[in-house]
């Protein structure tokens, strides 16, 4: 049998978790239609507290990723199609299949499919272990 004081702590902790979860969900912007990021692999690195995440971003014609940031370096390679890469403070750049780019941590950016075909980009992210790969920005 659980003691009443322990039971109160458990109920309070559960309630706090639910309230915090609702707050996070309410603040998240809606998902971008026509954009999908599929994880390929995730592994710890030799540097303590760091991990690498690889994912394929698929951007349908006319769609975009939406403005977002990453907590670490993004090293990306365009597998298929063409994208327009918009990085805050820089002119937009066109990246075609076979081209690569690097985005520094915390940099606000957006990728748009260009050229009327699906664009697929392989992203490699070096991040602190347990952090989300991407954070949407309004």
Question: Which positions does each model-derived feature cover?
Answer:
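Ligand-binding loop in jelly-roll beta-barrel domains
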Residues: 73, 92, 106-132
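Glycine- and acidic-residue-biased ligand/ion/polar-headgroup-sensing regions
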Residues: 70-90, 99, 129
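A short glycine-rich, His/Asp/Glu-containing loop-to-beta-strand
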Residues: 32-67, 124
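Bacterial N-terminal signal peptides
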Residues: 11-21
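Bacterial N-terminal signal peptides that target proteins for export
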Residues: 2-13
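Sec/Tat signal peptide C-region and signal peptidase I cleavage site
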Residues: 22-29
């Amino acid at each position: 049998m659980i003691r009443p004081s322990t039971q109160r702590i458990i109920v309070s902790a559960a309630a706090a978790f639910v309230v915090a979860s609702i707050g996070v969900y309410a603040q998240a912007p809606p998902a971008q239609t026509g954009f999908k990021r599929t994880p390929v692999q995730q592994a710890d690195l030799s540097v303590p507290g760091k991990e690498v995440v690889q994912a394929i971003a698929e951007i349908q014609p006319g769609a975009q990723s939406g403005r977002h940031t990453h907590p670490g370096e993004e090293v990306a390679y365009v597998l298929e199609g063409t994208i327009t890469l918009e990085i805050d403070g820089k002119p937009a750049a066109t990246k075609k299949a076979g081209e690569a780019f690097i985005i520094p941590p915390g940099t606000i950016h957006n990728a748009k499919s260009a050229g009327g075909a699906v664009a697929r980009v392989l992203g490699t992210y070096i991040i602190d272990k347990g952090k989300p790969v991407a954070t949407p920005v309004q």
